[in-house]
Amino acid sequence: MIDRERDSLVMDVARLKDELESLRDEDNAIGSITSPTSCEHVSVEEGKKIAPASPGEHLTSERIRLFLSFFKGRDDVYARLWSSKRSGKEGYSPACKNEWVQDICEKKKKMRCASCPSREFIPLTDETIMNHLEGLQTIGIYPLLPEGRCHLLAIDFDKDSWREDAVALLGTSRLIGIPAAFERSRSGNGAHIWMFFSEAVSARDARNLGCYLITETMSSNRNLPMSSYDRLFPNQDSVPKGGFGNLIALPFQKEAVDKGNTLFLDDDLRPLPDQWGFLASVERITPGKLEGLLREANKHGQVLGVGTGFADMDEQPWAAKPSWRFKSPPLQGPLPESIIAVLGNQLYIEKGGLSPALLNRIRRVAAFQNPEFYKKQNLRLSTALTPRMICCAEDFPHHVGLPRGCLDELIELLGELGIDLDLRDERPLGIDIETSFRGELTPQQKAAASDLVSYDMGVLVAPPGSGKTVIGAYMIAARAINTLVLVHRRLLLEQWQQRLQEFLDIESSLIGQIGGPKDRSTGFIDIATMQSLFRKKQVADVVTEYGHIIVDECHHVPAISFEQILRNARPRHVLGLTATLKRRDGLHPIILMQCGAVRHASGLRRSDDSQALERTLIRRDTEFAYETEETDPFIHDIYDRMINDEGRNSLILADILSALEAGRSPILLTGRREHLQFFASRLEGNVRNMIVLYGGMDAKARRLAMEHLSSIPDTEERLIIATGSYIGEGFDDPRLDTLFLAMPVSFDGTITQYAGRLERPFLGKKEVLIYDYVDAKVPMLLRMYKKRLRTYRGKGYREV
């Protein structure tokens, strides 16, 4: 009896010792997550040696429930890993009962699974999780729920610096008080930082928490890239049309675990000894705590830490109050008395001695939120390939490079911080040229030129017909150094050639061109198409040889090829010319970064004759309707049906013939070549002179069309039919007085360009007319008209 009791006590003591040892292991495991940061590299092979027993062993229903209680996403569908034996490629797709079933599965037709009419998704079950943990399959979940909520947030790190970046962010989460878990990814060459919520929260709030963590981490880690903002799970606030949002692979997959991967790590990148114990110990973030964290983050502007630009402004951005610019919180810690910078093709700031927080602030001078990301998100389109942030800063081993136009903002930032800028100017002076301006500027043009000549770089914003090319010629004479004029179309190249010969007192042989049939540069004054200077992703060396660069229609600068040309050029003077600074994609800040601030705008007037014109908008309501079962049809589908609508087209044709009978000089604009051809064929023989112009015309056809146009007497009937993209920029025909807008647009910059074709002064011109065809029975097209109407009214048009 005593022996049995003694044996029982011995067993109890042994059991208690085991439990105590287990608790110590768990305490050490959890303690390692809060130990001092270390980024000692641990290879996959080392990870395999020190990996604990596989989480897939000794599985119980309790452990599966624990797993599912943390890794919660959609339960009506999950993603399954596939691999191709032929190509070796891998990927994930929604698990579907009909996958690759002959005559049912639509994958071969490139149809998205979420849109497939034959889809029959397999729900996520305990058995599915069991198979994943035992290594029978690899699965991922879709964290974003249909109602725009989520139970978790994850941040992915997959660059070469993933170890340092992940550990740095983990350190930030501790400082802020956000519980997080550090997992090595399936490949072994990346990591996930996981955060879990006690209940479903708004995906927007969860993602803002992730952005806040990244922004704060950048103040202590100088190498964390801006692209980190695009590595969140979920990656958008609402479920995109035809999809589920991004997926994330689940941890504890047995095959990966056997290699030391998909396990939770300590700061030394070693797998924790008790994976299940650690998971059970992870604290979940309550909605109240999340709300408090975001309130503090928003108060200090630290969710993204950059401004929004002026993408959604209706007013002119150059006239806006400074409050649109982002106000950063004060920097903590010691700051240098001065920083050293070199101004060349970019503004190079020496990194030496600068804290990560200051470097981060400097980089953000050249960063802004990407309006296209938010536009797609609001339309419930996928944002997978659309970055949330645009950063034009460039990192070099010992310098940070900012675009030249950021100099003023950098000086302002450093002034606020009490730091002097020691700037060395390494821009070449250029080659002196002898020329003079032989024209006469109007008083308004003189005022603009006076503002521009006071600065090394800047932008002139002026309406069509105000003489921007003439001002450009004046600036060439005023600078008196060799000049490169950049254009994006051959038509503009030819116009600049003519205008410079007209307004500059210089031998025509010294005005060269790069691109086009007469490719001959002089090194003194050259006009170049952007395409001729950027071939095979390489910028031509010649761009570095000019002391003065003029960028015509500079609102095209954000195009990657155009931006690269300016990024590599080293001019002392840059002048941007445009009628509208705003872009549909919201990338306007890049224009200012490359060309400098707006130095003169809006006050520049056209000639008195142009100002005296009466502007009339004639609204023509159509009967066009678009009936579909889709609640939100694609615009191109609407356009396809609209351009073939007989009633609508007949209305436009009748109006054109009436205008011609009234002796007007009209132009019809459409966005589709087939629409243009329809009107050309129907009007053939009914118009004395008809000129058809469109993008993609060969040089000979374009030259013959323009010669025909210029040969028509002012008193003779004529009609121009063109695509809007061809006419929008550089087309100059003062006789035009009537516009037929045959296809709807909404962007105010486009309307400004189109209306500008009519508003050039011409003898006897007293009134200009715009016929706008309003498709009020199609809600999307009616909304577009309302946007156009605001622009018309702003330009002084009276609606009748």
Question: Where does each model-flagged region fall?
Answer:
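Conserved pre-motif I regulatory segment
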Residues: 391-395, 413-416, 422-461
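Conserved helicase ATPase core of P-loop NTP-dependent helicases/translocases
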Residues: 494, 510-521, 538, 677-678, ...
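Post-DEXD/H (motif II) to motif III coupling segment of the RecA-like Helicase ATP-binding lobe
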Residues: 547-548, 555-616, 792
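Conserved interdomain hinge at the start of the Helicase C-terminal
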Residues: 630-671, 678-681
